[in-house]
Amino acid sequence: DFGNIRHEGGVAFNSGKKPVKMIKRFLEYFESRDICVLDFFAGSGSTGHAVLNLNKEDGGDRKFILCTNNENGICENITYQRIKTVITGKREDGSDYSDGIPANLKYYRTDFVSKNEEYLSDTLLEHVAEMIQLEHGIKLDGRRYITVMNDDEADRLAEHWSEYPDVKALYVSKNVLFTTEQNALFKDVDIHIIPDYYFNFELREVGETW
């Protein structure tokens, strides 16, 4: 497999790729087919490639998170492109690579939020959408999956509720208190309270929670 490794994933990555077959062998040691695999030093994306292949072979529901500091653009130009190629079956130049593997792929850039913000909890809430999407495996599209961060948003949503026939779930700040009428209106929709644990450590450090 090391002799064929340069062809895997449809991207070039000298002296760094790991054989997909080898990583799949490691993953097969886990009985569960519903695990989350973290590669905190991702390079060419072999781990993600292996997870996708194994899911296709045995019908598993494994997920993966690939992390890299994007040095020299490695994440954008190598890791992301490889996983995209495996999923779509098309190389970056448009040529055929494979039949593809149906899957979802999200790319996030991380950054630091200053602890000197006057109200850190309000600032962190601006970034809560990414956390919700990662945990629940959904896309907050404002139609099927909607966030409600304050009472004014709840009022507007209720006022225009007839315009949202496809709503499946609401993700609601714990500070929002629905009225009796709103509870009746939203009764057929899954409601998830946005939990403190997303940023509990950070808020405890600055004394906004305990």
Name each model-derived stretch:
Residues 1-3, 13, 20-36, 56-210:
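Accessory, often C-terminal, charged low-complexity segments
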Residues 8:
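ATP-dependent phospho-/nucleotidyl transfer catalytic cores
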Residues 18-21, 43:
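Short, glycine/acidic-rich beta->alpha junctions
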Residues 35-54:
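A phosphate-binding catalytic loop at a beta-strand-loop-alpha-helix junction
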